[in-house]
């Protein structure tokens, strides 16, 4: 699967999509393929604040539990509750159905510090 060019990426394998004044966050195809079949997703609540490089939730697969790391600072304005009943969306549709949270960024310039698709692909080749 190709890496969508219109997103930014963190070293912890989260993606960020700018949508006006907000950003949508999820995990990458590479991350879900490394984790295997996702069976549970734990996400924070609307109104919670996230801090860049700090955990904001977790995904549990048949292999392991992995923390989700915030790529930017901000306040959560929306959570994808569909993942409660359908965690398999993370495997099936990591960039569409399986977004995790929507955030109002504290500072939109932080997004520029994240990797482009090309940089992310280069990093994951080395893993």
UniProtKB/Swiss-Prot annotation:
Cofactor needs: (R)-lipoate
Name of this chain's protein: Glycine cleavage system H protein
CDD domains for the chain: GCS_H
Secretion signal, residue range per the UniProt entry: none
Presence of the UniProt keyword Kinase in the record: no
Source domain of life: Bacteria
InterPro entries: 2-oxoA_DH_lipoyl-BS (IPR003016), Biotin_lipoyl (IPR000089), GCV_H (IPR002930), GCV_H/Fam206 (IPR033753), GCV_H_sub (IPR017453), Single_hybrid_motif (IPR011053)
Cofactor binding comment, as recorded: Binds 1 lipoyl cofactor covalently.
PANTHER family, alphabetized: GLYCINE CLEAVAGE SYSTEM H PROTEIN (PTHR11715), GLYCINE CLEAVAGE SYSTEM H PROTEIN-RELATED (PTHR11715:SF3)
Organism: Bacillus pumilus (strain SAFR-032)
Main function: The glycine cleavage system catalyzes the degradation of glycine. The H protein shuttles the methylamine group of glycine from the P protein to the T protein. Is also involved in protein lipoylation via its role as an octanoyl/lipoyl carrier protein intermediate.
Residues with the N6-lipoyllysine modification: 63
Keywords: Lipoyl
């Amino acid at each position: 699967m190709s890496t969508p060019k219109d997103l930014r990426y963190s070293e912890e394998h989260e993606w960020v999509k700018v949508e006006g004044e907000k950003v949508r966050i999820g995990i990458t195809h590479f991350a879900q393929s490394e984790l295997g079949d996702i069976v549970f997703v734990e996400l924070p609540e609307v109104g919670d604040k996230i801090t860049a490089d700090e955990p904001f939730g977790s995904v549990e697969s048949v292999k392991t539990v992995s923390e989700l790391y915030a790529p930017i600072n901000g306040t959560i304005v929306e959570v994808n509750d569909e993942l409660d009943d359908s965690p398999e969306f993370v495997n099936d549709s990591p960039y569409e159905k399986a977004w995790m949270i929507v955030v109002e960024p504290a500072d939109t310039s932080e997004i520029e510090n994240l990797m482009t698709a090309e940089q992310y692909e280069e990093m994951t080749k080395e893993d």
